[in-house]
Amino acid sequence: MSQIAGFDAAPASELRPRLLALTESPLWADQLLGERPYGDLEHLLDASDRIIRALPADQVDAALAGHPRIGERASGLDPEAAARSAREQAGMSRADPETASAMAEGNADYEARFGRIYLVAAAGRSAADLLAFLRERLRHDPETELDVVRGELARITRLRLAGDFGTSGQEAS
């Protein structure tokens, strides 16, 4: 049985905790489970994207609870989630002290402006790229930025879902 077939057939009570470990939005998890079956990975990923992009602000904020600040080590997460976060933010681990300091300052500015952590799909991006993206996003109005956060959350969740439920030969696109 493929992982997607298993996902489609498994009890919601078994899958919900796994989904919430990927993105801590109960509404997202419940809607994703409620729309089964998907049949293949791409349909699952597309549904996830659509649901996340429609989340109300409070559910976006709930989802952010499982994400550490960019450039900070994950604390309070289970070891698997902390390791995943470290892999996703690997570019920041190679940041020079000046860039790391600027990122910490930018994180504080972002949180003061928007009331939530700066979320970006960090996998594969350098520290300099992450900092430049942060500075660009600080110029957004709150509504535009919330849409950007939803898009970044969708990208991160897509990668995590593909990692957890993809079958060999299938990747997130």
Give the location of each predicted region:
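Aromatic-anchored, charged helix-turn/loop surface patch used as a conserved interaction hotspot
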Residues: 1-109, 155-173
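Residues forming anionic-ligand binding surfaces in small-molecule and nucleic-acid pockets
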Residues: 113
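Conserved catalytic/binding loops enriched for acidic/polar residues
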Residues: 118
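Short glycine-enriched loops at secondary-structure junctions
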Residues: 123-125
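Long, amphipathic alpha-helical surface segments
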Residues: 127-173
